[in-house]
């Protein structure tokens, strides 16, 4: 009998595996398939044909666009080996050969180009079929544009010898500080010839030593001058006023990963002096080092050892020509700790540059924003640095490097890369604005490796940086209105950065400035209790009510990157993309079934999103949004992951649970399984965890008012086993909904 039971069970297991494998295959999109589907929806027709035409000396390629043809008269016969020419809507375009960038600089070549637009492939590859349409459209619609760049991927053979697209490099919008740090434009740029030749003439007058550099570096230099001459390093980033445009589409297919070919490309050392031109609008008082005073503002309470360790690391390791002061803002340490702090601060050694340390004691409930605002009000500096008391300085030039950026007239907030103590594990490398909320980028990843085309190297423009280490000019802080005091704990730094961006400034994260962050020593982690989770949700509501235009958007994070889950890496969206057109989930009371299940922590319940469906789409509640919907369209959106440790997850059917905390009534919500490559990669020792993700859309009218706790019911389809476990996440259903 036992053998028969085992045989029947194996038949059931095999059946589950077949169904599971089919679903995995259907949900596991490849980048190649996903991007082609995206581009097909753009409706861009491939209407370009190429023809050969004979010049005076040899054959070269002329491209005909939409039936237009420009006869070659041999005017360019001395350099036509390196050119392709075509016309689009009465504009002449010339594509130069990437071979040019491996040869010595030839200024005469660039000066003699007679064309409206130059397309420069910086390495070998192919211009995409949609590129010319987008480039032409942008130049036509914006007369102020002088340069266009786009995204790129790699075309290569897969294991079946088919040519497929892979390795997408999805770039940010115009990022002036990243451009000064590295040539992130990549494989293809398009420039207006007139602007390029104007910058070329400027460099000629400056007697650039063309023989001392390669053509790529030389063009990098010309592009810098071109962008500078057209105010690309200025406050303000309205699309019609910025001379550089990022087309958020794949415009180039490289033969190998492009980043590896230009990652070491830098502006010439001789150009450091030229970069100083960007500072020309800084007030004279700030041009001299002695005119700068940095106020380091440190909020702290009842952490004398941690606080003093932070301050000692500043004094012992900082080497700077700038003057600075330290202000400690204490919101109510005990008398014993207060005395200890005052004694230690009064005994601090004098160091070069440090102009004193003040202790501001004002008992009040914890409010990070209010404490920082108090410190800023009392500070004497024209630059402000907000620093957590659990930070540790580890490099001498950290302050000077941050000040270098913070003093630029177009720069807003300046942050640093933070690591967990005594490790190379990243805690923070900027903040991106995902649909599920702001996220620390690259958190928990190894800083010893290069991540997503250098995102943990060099200098980057980001929408936000953590307030744990955030520097800015006083005028920037005051223009933004300081920290919002209704955001007492969370999102106050994000809100400030978003406001600074909306005011026209560029926020910066310097990955070449590294500090250790002994995170959350003072108040614990957000979301670890029901009270903290609900407070976090309320503060997130305030954030997006204030910044509705930014909800679900980030100019420095490509929309083809993952936006729909809490993502610290830079993963293309084909790995996880939410479609709200999913059917409404079936829901039923299942209190008895849940009570009969075994509660077991081996059933992992991960919640990532539980929110009003309208908020998911628009960032605010229906009464505060501009889009109006009917009551039938109102509901909730749930998303997360779940798996059973040490079991065959292909055999389990899972049901999301919502338990009314007052009456104990339990609702079961049918789920859609989602492919989660990130979970799979982190659970290499677990079986069949490809479809650990889940999502559901629930009509609002099903739930009565109250607070509901989330859980999961997992039923083994090949045995009688039922498991249940509960999350600490809750959903608050208001009485007025």
How should each PLM-predicted stretch be described?
Residues 2-58, 259-294, 422, 436-461, ...:
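C-terminal, non-catalytic tails of nucleotide-sugar-dependent glycosyltransferases
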Residues 51-54, 85, 89, 125, ...:
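Basic, ligand-binding patches in group-transfer machinery
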Residues 76-111, 315-364:
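Acidic donor-binding segment of Leloir-type glycosyltransferases
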Residues 117-118, 384:
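Short aromatic/hydrophobic "clamp" motif used to bind/position activated sugar donors
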Residues 167-193, 369-370, 434-475:
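A recurrent flexible, glycine/aromatic-enriched loop bordering the glycosyltransferase active site
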Residues 195, 209-242, 247-248, 399-402, ...:
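A short, conserved alpha-helix in the catalytic core of glycosyltransferases
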């Amino acid at each position: 009998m036992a053998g028969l039971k085992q045989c029947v069970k194996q038949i059931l297991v095999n059946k589950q595996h077949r169904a599971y494998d089919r679903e995995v295959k259907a949900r596991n999109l490849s980048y190649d398939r996903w991007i082609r589907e995206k581009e097909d929806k753009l409706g861009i027709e491939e209407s370009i044909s190429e023809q050969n035409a004979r010049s005076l000396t040899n054959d070269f390629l002329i491209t005909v666009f939409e039936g237009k043809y420009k006869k070659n008269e041999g005017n360019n016969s001395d350099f036509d080996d390196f050119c392709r020419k075509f016309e689009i809507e009465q504009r002449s375009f010339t594509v130069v050969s990437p071979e040019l960038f491996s040869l010595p600089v030839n200024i005469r070549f660039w000066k003699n180009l007679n064309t409206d637009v130059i397309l420069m492939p910086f390495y070998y590859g192919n211009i995409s079929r949609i590129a010319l349409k987008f480039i032409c459209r942008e130049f036509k619609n914006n007369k102020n544009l002088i340069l266009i760049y786009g995204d790129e991927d790699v075309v290569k053979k897969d294991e079946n010898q088919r040519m497929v697209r892979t390795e997408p490099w999805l770039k940010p919008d115009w990022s002036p500080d990243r451009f000064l740090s590295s040539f992130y434009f990549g494989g293809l740029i398009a420039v207006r010839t007139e602007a390029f030749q104007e910058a070329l003439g400027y460099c000629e007058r400056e007697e650039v030593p063309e023989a001392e550099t390669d053509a790529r570096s030389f063009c990098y230099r010309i592009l810098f001058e071109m962008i500078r001459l057209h105010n690309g390093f200025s406050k303000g980033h309205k699309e019609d006023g910025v001379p550089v445009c990022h087309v958020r589409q794949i415009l180039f297919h490289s033969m190998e990963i492009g980043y590896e070919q230009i990652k070491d490309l830098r502006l010439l050392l001789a150009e450091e002096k030229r970069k100083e031109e960007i500072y020309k609008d800084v007030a004279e008082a700030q041009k001299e080092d002695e005119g700068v005073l940095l106020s380091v503002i440190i909020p702290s309470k009842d952490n004398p050892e941690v606080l003093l360790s932070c301050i000692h690391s500043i004094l012992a390791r900082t080497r700077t020509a700038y003057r600075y002061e330290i202000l400690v803002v204490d919101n109510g340490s005990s008398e014993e700790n207060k005395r200890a702090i005052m004694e230690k601060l009064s005994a601090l050694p004098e160091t070069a540059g440090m102009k004193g340390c003040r202790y501001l004691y004002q008992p009040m409930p914890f409010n990070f924003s209010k404490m920082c605002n108090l410190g800023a009000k009392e500070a004497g500096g024209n630059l402000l640095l907000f620093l957590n008391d659990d930070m540790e300085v580890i490099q001498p030039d950290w302050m000077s490097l941050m000040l270098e950026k913070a003093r630029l007239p177009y720069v807003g907030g300046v942050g640093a890369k933070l690591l967990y103590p005594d490790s190379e594990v990243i805690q923070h490398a900027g903040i991106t604005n995902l649909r599920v909320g702001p996220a620390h980028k690259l958190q928990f990843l190894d800083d010893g490796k290069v991540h997503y085309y250098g995102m943990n190297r060099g200098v980057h423009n980001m929408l936000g940086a953590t307030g744990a280490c955030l520097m800015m000019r006083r005028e920037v802080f005051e223009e933004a209105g300081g920290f919002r005091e209704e955001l007492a704990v969370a999102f106050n730094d994000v809100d400030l950065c978003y406001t600074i961006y909306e005011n026209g400034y560029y926020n910066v994260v310097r990955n070449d400035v590294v500090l250790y962050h002994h995170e959350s020593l003072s108040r614990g982690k957000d979301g670890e209790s029901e009270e903290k989770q609900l407070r976090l949700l309320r503060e997130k509501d305030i954030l997006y009510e204030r910044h509705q235009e930014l909800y679900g958007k980030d100019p420095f994070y490509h929309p083809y990157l993952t936006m729909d889950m809490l993502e610290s890496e830079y993963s293309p969206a084909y790995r996880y993309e939410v479609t709200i057109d999913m059917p409404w989930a079936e829901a039923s009371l299942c209190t008895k079934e849940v009570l009969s299940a075994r509660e077991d922590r081996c059933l992992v319940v991960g919640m990532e999103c539980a929110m009003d469906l309208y908020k998911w789409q628009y960032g605010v509640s229906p009464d505060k949004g501009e889009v109006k919907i009917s009551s039938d369209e109102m509901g909730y959106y749930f998303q997360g992951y779940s798996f059973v440790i040490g079991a065959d997850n292909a055999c389990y059917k899972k049901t999301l649970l919502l338990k009314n905390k007052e009456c104990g009534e339990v609702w079961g919500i049918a789920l859609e399984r989602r492919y989660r490559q990130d979970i799979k990669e982190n659970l290499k020792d677990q079986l069949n965890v490809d479809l650990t993700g889940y999502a559901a859309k629930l009509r609002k009218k099903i739930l009565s008012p109250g607070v509901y706790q989330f859980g999961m019911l997992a039923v083994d389809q090949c045995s009688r086993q039922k498991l249940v476990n509960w999350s600490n996440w809750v959903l608050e259903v208001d009485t007025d909904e």
